[in-house]
């Protein structure tokens, strides 16, 4: 059961990562090749001023790094990501979720739903954020996230908000800064978005943490239930035999790990004898060896 669950998570993570990378690339290329848009100022190379683009780029880099681990997981029948990559993905998923919520609840009422969620914005405002949220919350779940990692995930948003405030409010467009393309300092006092941004972002991070950790705990409970079962014993013996058969050489001896098999039997609720388990191992080995 656990191997099937791990494989399912691995496949969905691979598909999600490929789609996010492809959609982000498509959206950014569309912005770069659109030199003029009457509804949006920042096209061409200026598209990299926008949080939408930078947040999607951040999560796409993280998802791109996931791909080699998923391929390795399918090959070795074990999918696992390092802790640093989970934290990186948390930061990226937090950023694009903020992008989605701002697009849906702030930009759409002012500019229209169709305008905000069509063209390149269909990929950058909707597809990538939603898929990243689902993948991180329910399928990339082999690490328990603590609150210190949630604080680290706020860094990209904090850096961008600080830069936006500097370029828009302190410097201003007349002196070479940015125009207020998000309207955050135009419709309300500039300090309000700055003060509200981090608490809202932290709430998003905690929501992602909640779903991710719930998936992690559910998987761990399943592992504990399976760990002492008859099926666990069989799967371990079969896996070990197949791995050793893959490394078999024409003139090498067949070695049955009897002590390890005995240890497995003693620590499960199986009623198999050591002899029966060794025979199972030998049969699996012979069925999978090339020689």
Where are these regions (language model features)?
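Short, highly charged, low-complexity non-transmembrane loops/tails of multi-pass membrane proteins
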Residues: 216-235
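Membrane-interface transmembrane-helix boundary segments in multi-pass integral membrane proteins
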Residues: 169-211
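N-terminal membrane topogenic signal
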Residues: 2-19
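Juxtamembrane "helix-exit" motif on the non-cytosolic side of transmembrane helices
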Residues: 31-40, 104-113, 170
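Non-cytosolic membrane-interface motifs at loop->transmembrane helix junctions
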Residues: 42-50, 112-123, 148-149
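Alpha-helical transmembrane segments of multi-pass membrane proteins
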Residues: 21-35
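Alpha-helical transmembrane segments in multipass membrane proteins, preferentially the mid-helix core
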Residues: 129-146
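Charged, low-complexity interaction regions
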Residues: 245-255, 268-275
């Amino acid at each position: 059961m656990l191997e099937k669950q791990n494989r399912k998570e691995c496949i969905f993570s691979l598909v999600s990562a490929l789609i996010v990378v492809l959609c982000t690339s498509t959206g950014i290329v569309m912005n770069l090749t659109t030199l003029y848009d009457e509804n949006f100022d920042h096209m061409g190379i200026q598209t990299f001023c926008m949080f939408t683009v930078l947040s999607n780029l951040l999560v796409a880099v993280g998802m791109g790094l996931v791909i080699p681990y998923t391929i390795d997981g399918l090959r070795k029948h074990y999918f696992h990501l390092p802790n640093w990559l989970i934290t990186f993905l948390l930061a990226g998923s937090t950023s694009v979720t903020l992008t989605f919520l701002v697009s849906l609840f702030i930009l759409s009422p002012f500019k229209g739903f169709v305008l905000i969620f069509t063209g390149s914005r269909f990929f950058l405002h909707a597809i990538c954020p939603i898929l990243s949220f689902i993948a991180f919350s329910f399928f990339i779940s082999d690490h328990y996230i603590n609150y210190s990692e949630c604080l680290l995930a706020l860094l990209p948003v904090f850096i961008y908000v600080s830069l936006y405030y500097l370029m828009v409010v302190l410097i201003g467009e007349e002196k070479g800064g940015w125009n207020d393309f998000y309207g955050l300092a135009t419709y309300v006092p500039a300090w309000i978005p700055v003060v509200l941004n981090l608490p809202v972002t932290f709430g998003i991070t905690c929501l992602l943490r909640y779903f991710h950790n719930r998936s992690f705990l559910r998987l761990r409970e399943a592992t504990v239930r399976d760990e002492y079962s008859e099926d666990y014993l069989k799967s371990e013996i079969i896996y070990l035999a197949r791995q050793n058969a893959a490394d078999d050489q024409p003139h090498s001896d067949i070695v049955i790990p009897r002590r390890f098999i005995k240890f497995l039997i003693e620590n499960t609720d199986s009623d198999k004898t050591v002899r029966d388990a060794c025979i199972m191992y030998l049969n699996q080995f012979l069925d999978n060896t090339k020689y």
